[in-house]
Amino acid sequence: MKDDSAVVPDGVLRVFADKSEIKADGVEEVTFRVMFGSQDVTAETTCTLIRTFEGNQNYMAGGVNKFSTTAPGTYTFKARYYYAGALYSDNEVEVVATPYFTGEEENYLQRVLGVYFTSTGCTSCPTASKGIANLQQAYPGMISIVSFHDDMVVDDPMKIEETAVFKAAFGGFQGLPRLFWNMRNGTDIIGPVFTDSYLEELGQYTPSCGVAVSAAYDENTRKLDIELGIKSNIPASYRYLLFLVEDDVDGYEQAGVNGSYLHQNVIRDVLVKSASGEKINNGLPLPVGSEVKASKSVVLDQSWNADNMRVVVAAMLSSDGGFTFVADNVNECAVGSSVSYLYAE
């Protein structure tokens, strides 16, 4: 990238890009520089790139200056920088992402991951949970929900260590309930109606991959052997998240509800300890159209009801040089069963 600092007047914020065109293959990147006068502020956490695509505006993480995509089209970028107040760039840069096609492209079904935070001490959570269930009924087979429990007023007996890890990944927000789509920051919503936010998330992207899951279970040993597969239309590097969830969990009181209450989508374990996911294929780009597999094993706790449990796997991609990862597609199966790749009709 050439040195543009000399052309930026003092007190002016301006953004530059090293490319005006990239392939929409999830691999090729454009790199930005943000100048405040003669000062390069690109890497500062108070400097944010604002991306606009098809009318939708998204704020990239502070200090991030790389962008790739799997969705062809025209993107515009401007910069915001906090310096005794919010400053915005006096220009925008345009990046065109051209279609990437190898002749082997599959039309994978677009399923969305919903990461939900709730608590037995939250009086508003039952209404939000009902709203999520209504959304799943309206769009059957299209949404996988995983629910982290957290303490609120009282200690929640279904809280796990990973609750704090994933909560931190979303900026350590305050207040419940919260639902995030596809591990994407800024998508959180309290509900209880989630339809608009779900449809907006669908419009953000077209999935580039499919996910298959097998969950073989030994009732005697309670050992669960999980095998997952990812097939991709693009030569991108993927990660994956793997959740064990249980439905119809009873025996715990719920604030805001009189009498018994069944908890759904309760995360019992996360077999990948980073909220960014675990690398697959040793972190190397996936061969287009070829399946790459990974496996995990776990012994189920005696208190968990295997008959009510599911395995949820999300394939993760980064569009900002590996700083953040979001779910590109998700699939799930019951413990003791399997599910193959799903295709749109």
Each predicted region: which residue ranges?
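Short, solvent-exposed loop/turn segments at the edges of extracellular beta-sandwich modules
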Residues: 82-87, 319-321
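Beta-strand-rich structural segments
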Residues: 16-18, 26-39
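Exposed beta-strand face motif in extracellular beta-rich ectodomains
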Residues: 28, 73-77, 307-311
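Short, conserved sequence motifs used for protein processing/export or organelle targeting and
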Residues: 147-345
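Short tyrosine-centred short linear motifs in exposed loops/low-complexity segments
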Residues: 25, 69-79, 236
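Bacterial Sec-dependent N-terminal signal peptides
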Residues: 1-22, 85-93, 97, 105-109, ...
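Local sequence-structure signature of Cys/Sec-based thiol-disulfide redox active-site neighborhoods
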Residues: 103-148
